[in-house]
Amino acid sequence: FFIDEDQRVTWSDIGRKAEIELRARLAGATVTHMQLQSQFRCNGSDGYLAWLDDVLGIRPTANSVLDPDDFDFQIFDSPVAVRRKIEALNAKDNRARMVAGYCWDWKSKRTVGAMDVVLPEHGFSMQWNLARDEGLWITALESVKQIGCIHTCQGLEVDYIGVIVGPDLVVRDGQVITQPERRSRQDRSLR
């Protein structure tokens, strides 16, 4: 099993290390612990992972600043600016996409042409990734015109990702706070 106990997509996610060890013992299996030393997804940088842990408040680390020479990390004031940047980066080799937490209803699933992620204060609207693309949406040529949700991008890889932070994630008094009640009621992972 490959486990990151700091990540969870649904309330019902199972597989904590202690639970797997218990089940293995009950089945008479031997457990061998190994640690992933680096990840290709983040240039093999443990510093990037430590920075994420620090900035998201998972655990304090010595990496409170991201090295700008290793990563292109930008914060935009507008989702329109994010979309423009992602479209420009994608024009090179089809390896840039946008994602968001499941905070907006998936209206286009039933109503062709309906927009899903709508932020009227920014003049921004896009559709969720299309149902017809299923698990391959991120590689489809036209998917740069869609937004993937956390359920459809988990484990997939691109060179550039634009993240729309929805109302389920806020910063209060310097702390990152999750508000799961602000996610779409269509999100079955909340049940």
Q: How would you describe each model-predicted region?
A:
Residues F1-L36:
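Signature of the SF2 helicase/ATPase Hel1-core->accessory helical subdomain module
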